Amino acid sequence: MTARKPGWLRVNVPGGARYQQVRDTVKGLALHTVCEEAHCPNVAECWGGGTATVMLMGDVCTRGCRFCNVKTDAHPPPLDPDEPRHLAEAIAELGLDYIVVTSVDRDDLPDGGAGHFADAIRRLKDIPQLLVEVLTPDFRGDAEAVRTVGRARPDVFANNLETVRRLTPVVRDLKAGYDQTLAVLARMKREFPRIVTKSSIMVGLGETEDELLEAMGDLRAAGVEILTLGQYLRPSAWHLPVVEYVKPEKFAAWREAGLGLGFRYVASGPLVRSSYRAAELFLRGELASRPPGP
């Protein structure tokens, strides 16, 4: 039985001049955005503020996670080699100073798309004053693919744990893995310590309080610095049902628990998503204070 959606999950209707500008630019340059593909509830806030989370490598994923609304196919279309250049042109046209770049999983490619991702990062880093956050696939845990992305020097590297250990085989595609995600995050922080690491967990899927706190602790042990916690919202009747709509006060308590574990920043709330822009100002200050290095 699916829980009934409460009033605190209401969102603003998208609109406004800045929202329309971002929408028109995204459409005109044929960009794929998570905001649209995943039906993100924060599209009004982010696009209205001139921020978008864009997707690389097309809009068809080789994995079929049971919480995600992105299209899936074992054999998606080939990569567009001009996509990284087009992406950088679009971001320059939008005039942003912070961009989140994510992608579908591409298990059909030898490097999982790591080289394509790195090309996009380097082009984006050529835009003055632009900070680049990437939310990448796990590349099946391949160390060299992770290094390829790290060498491109994104400012923030994110890979999402998504849920607690017990629920991972139910919630995520079987090609993903709880320990695989932790290993990718740990490798990035170990080999590229100046890159800020980030991860996200959804709640309301049937996890217990102890399981959630354990997952948060596992992320800290992997060196993750930024954590986002948000309510799972069912995209369609074909996806996993919501077991619980968590009250805002519990999110507030988890934020304090996360800070107590040592996370540098925790965004925790019903409508928070992994690419949520609430951490943007914190990250800008954090990155500016870090000394140069690998």
Curated annotation (Swiss-Prot):
Q: Where is the signal peptide?
A: none
Tell me the compartments it is located in: Cytoplasm
Cystine crosslinks: none
What metabolic or biological pathway is this protein involved in?
A: Protein modification; protein lipoylation via endogenous pathway; protein N(6)-(lipoyl)lysine from octanoyl-[acyl-carrier-protein]: step 2/2
The record's listing under InterPro entries reads: Aldolase_TIM, Elp3/MiaA/NifB-like_rSAM, LIAS_N, Lipoyl_synth, rSAM
Keyword list, A-Z: 4Fe-4S, Cytoplasm, Iron, Iron-sulfur, Metal-binding, S-adenosyl-L-methionine, Transferase
Gene Ontology terms: cellular component:
cytoplasm
Record Pfam families: LIAS_N, Radical_SAM
- Write the Enzyme Commission number(s) for this entry: 2.8.1.8
Q: Which Gene3D superfamilies match?
A: Aldolase class I
Which residues of the sequence carry a binding annotation for [4Fe-4S] cluster 1?
A: C35, C40, C46, S275
Principal localisation:
cytoplasm
Q: Which GO terms describe its molecular function?
A: 4 iron, 4 sulfur cluster binding; lipoate synthase activity; metal ion binding
Q: Which reaction does it catalyse?
A: [[Fe-S] cluster scaffold protein carrying a second [4Fe-4S](2+) cluster] + N(6)-octanoyl-L-lysyl-[protein] + 2 oxidized [2Fe-2S]-[ferredoxin] + 2 S-adenosyl-L-methionine + 4 H(+) = [[Fe-S] cluster scaffold protein] + N(6)-[(R)-dihydrolipoyl]-L-lysyl-[protein] + 4 Fe(3+) + 2 hydrogen sulfide + 2 5'-deoxyadenosine + 2 L-methionine + 2 reduced [2Fe-2S]-[ferredoxin]
- Name the cofactor(s): [4Fe-4S] cluster
The free-text cofactor remark is: Binds 2 [4Fe-4S] clusters per subunit. One cluster is coordinated with 3 cysteines and an exchangeable S-adenosyl-L-methionine.
Family statement drawn from the similarity comment of this UniProt entry: Belongs to the radical SAM superfamily. Lipoyl synthase family.
- This one is known as Lipoyl synthase
Q: Which gene encodes it?
A: lipA
